[in-house]
């Protein structure tokens, strides 16, 4: 909850930033229509986890995916017409690093198995669409970029697919070439937030954007390839509605020309699910269990370029 509180403060601060009255310009920019095409390369690391319980088992199974790194290219579109703002982002990358820690427990809470597997042949993907309004904009002396504050609301689809190979630990070990487990996390989220650009000097400016995620829907498909007592289409399915999260990014930008700008910054995403349901698809039938919680974080620095038409 500490991360959620920090993100809430960021969004509130974006809406309350005071600016000197001398710099205010209540009129819209001279261009009624502005289109900006941008590209980023986001160097990320991530973690995902889920905890499952069942009747008589306060803690049945924990799966933790750690260090699932990816270099994520992003393409983003920004359309501003008078005071209306539209944003779209599309990105994804290949994951070829990381580990899976898989633990199972008895009804008394004792750990009955623990394995560690390597991650490969995985990927991350996201697409988002936001609309909003430019509530304030201004011109600053000795700066070529305008400042602004936008309020935003939108939707994001975020997928993390992981595949674990082999396994070391107890009660058994598996060869490293054998596909052991795959998890496919699919987050669908509503988000609200704000962003600002603050001119500093000449072409230099600072941008900050923050979103709160008040609601999300999560589906996780889990396949256990080495268990003969489970189906593989999938072996388990987790579903939860009502999660919470937040996303924030900050960057320093420099406008090389009136059209071309570069940026360097950092981006952090996190979503945590509400309690949900898990269905285990056995070869002899299905069993209902409880998804206690699932969580995904992805974060890291980025570099980008922007072209304003």
Regions found by a protein language model. Give the residues of each.
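Cleavable N-terminal export/targeting peptides
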Residues: 1-33
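N-terminal entry module detector
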Residues: 24-94
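Short loop/turn motifs that connect adjacent beta-strands in outer-membrane beta-barrel proteins
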Residues: 24-33, 78-85, 136-149, 200-206, ...
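Transmembrane beta-barrel strands of outer-membrane/channel proteins
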Residues: 35-43, 79, 88-94, 133, ...
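Extracellular/periplasm-exposed beta-strand and loop segments of Gram-negative cell-envelope proteins
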Residues: 45-70, 92-127, 156-189, 214-249, ...
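Residues on the lipid-exposed face of transmembrane beta-strands in outer-membrane beta-barrel proteins
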Residues: 75-81, 127-135, 142, 153-155, ...
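Short gly/pro-enriched beta-turn/loop segments at secondary-structure junctions
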Residues: 146-148, 185-191, 198-207, 243-245
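Extended, basic/helix-rich recognition subdomains
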Residues: 253, 261-263, 273
């Amino acid at each position: 909850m500490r991360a959620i509180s920090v993100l809430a403060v960021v969004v509130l601060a974006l809406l309350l930033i005071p600016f000197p009255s001398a710099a205010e310009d209540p009129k819209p920019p001279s261009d009624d229509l502005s289109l900006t095409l941008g590209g980023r390369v986001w160097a990320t690391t991530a973690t995902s986890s889920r905890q499952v319980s069942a009747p008589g088992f306060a803690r049945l199974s924990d799966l933790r995916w750690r260090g699932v790194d990816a270099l994520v290219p992003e393409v983003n579109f920004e359309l501003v017409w008078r005071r209306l703002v539209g944003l779209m982002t599309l990105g994804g990358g290949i994951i070829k690093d990381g580990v899976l820690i898989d633990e199972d427990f008895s009804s008394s809470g004792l750990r009955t198995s623990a394995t560690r597997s390597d991650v490969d042949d995985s990927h991350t993907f996201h697409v988002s669409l936001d609309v909003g309004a430019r509530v304030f904009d201004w011109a600053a002396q000795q700066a070529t970029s305008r400042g602004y504050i936008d309020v935003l609301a939108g939707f994001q689809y975020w997928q993390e697919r992981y595949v674990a190979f082999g396994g070391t630990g107890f009660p058994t070990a598996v060869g490293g070439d054998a596909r052991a487990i795959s998890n496919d996390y699919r987050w669908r989220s509503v988000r609200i937030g704000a962003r600002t650009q603050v001119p500093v000097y000449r072409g230099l400016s600072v941008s900050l954007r923050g979103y709160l995620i008040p609601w999300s829907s999560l589906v996780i498909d889990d396949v256990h390839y080495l268990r003969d007592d489970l189906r593989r289409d999938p072996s388990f399915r987790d579903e939860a509605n009502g999660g919470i999260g937040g996303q924030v990014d900050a960057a320093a930008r420099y406008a090389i020309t009136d059209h071309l700008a570069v940026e360097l910054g950092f981006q952090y995403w996190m979503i945590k699910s509400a309690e949900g349901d898990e269905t285990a698809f056995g070869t002899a039938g299905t069993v209902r269990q409880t998804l206690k919680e699932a969580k995904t974080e992805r974060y890291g620095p980025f570099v980008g370029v922007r072209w304003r038409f």
